[in-house]
């Protein structure tokens, strides 16, 4: 939705995975992780070279990595808008399960446990480095999105 709204290039390794034969409708997601990451980095480099608007989804639970990425975009002349969808771990786990049941994309529940609490802390650590940001929350089904806090003109 954001990429379409802003006519932006979506640079997402999960999207890349879908075109790799070894992905096997989601069952080989972990198998193609490194390959999809490499391909996505090339897509990102091309988008930057073209001056495209970019949507770059990232879990972002390591603030130092997130800030480094934000700095890279700023160094390339980009305005950095940070979006964070806040949700309790049980909701995130439910969405992960739904993603598997509906799309065949398997990710271990440990992905949620590993990031639990860290993503919000990371957002707090880097939000003021962004040109604009938004923290939003929604119902478990994704409806009724609410803005919790924001800075700048982001959406």
Per-region residue spans from a language model:
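Conserved substrate/cofactor phosphate-moiety recognition/catalytic segment
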Residues: 2-52
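Short, surface-exposed basic-aromatic patches at helix termini and helix-loop junctions that form
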Residues: 3-5, 67-81, 97-102, 127
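Conserved beta-strand scaffold positions in the cores of enzyme catalytic domains, especially
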Residues: 10, 82, 133-135
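Glycine-rich phosphate-binding loop used to anchor ATP phosphates in small-molecule kinases
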Residues: 31-84
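Short beta->alpha linker loops
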Residues: 60-64, 87-91, 114
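Short hydrophobic alpha-helical runs that function as membrane-insertion/retention elements
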Residues: 79-85, 104-109
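Conserved GTP-binding G-domain of TRAFAC-class P-loop NTPases and closely related GTPase folds
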Residues: 94-155
């Amino acid at each position: 939705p954001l990429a379409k709204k802003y006519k932006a290039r979506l640079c997402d390794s999960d999207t890349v995975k879908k075109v790799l034969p070894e992905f096997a409708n989601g069952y080989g997601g972990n198998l193609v992780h490194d390959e999809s990451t490499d391909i996505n980095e090339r897509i990102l480099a091309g988008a930057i070279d073209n001056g495209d608007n970019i949507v770059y989804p990232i879990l972002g639970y390591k603030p130092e990595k997130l800030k480094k990425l934000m700095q890279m975009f700023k160094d390339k002349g980009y305005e950095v808008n940070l979006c964070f969808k806040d949700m309790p771990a049980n909701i995130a786990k439910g969405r992960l399960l739904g993603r598997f049941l509906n799309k065949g994309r398997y990710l271990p529940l440990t992905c949620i446990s590993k990031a639990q609490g860290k993503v919000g802390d990371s957002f707090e650590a880097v939000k003021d480095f962004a040109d604009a940001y938004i923290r939003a929350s929604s119902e478990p089904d994704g409806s009724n999105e609410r803005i919790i806090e924001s800075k700048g003109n982001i959406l």
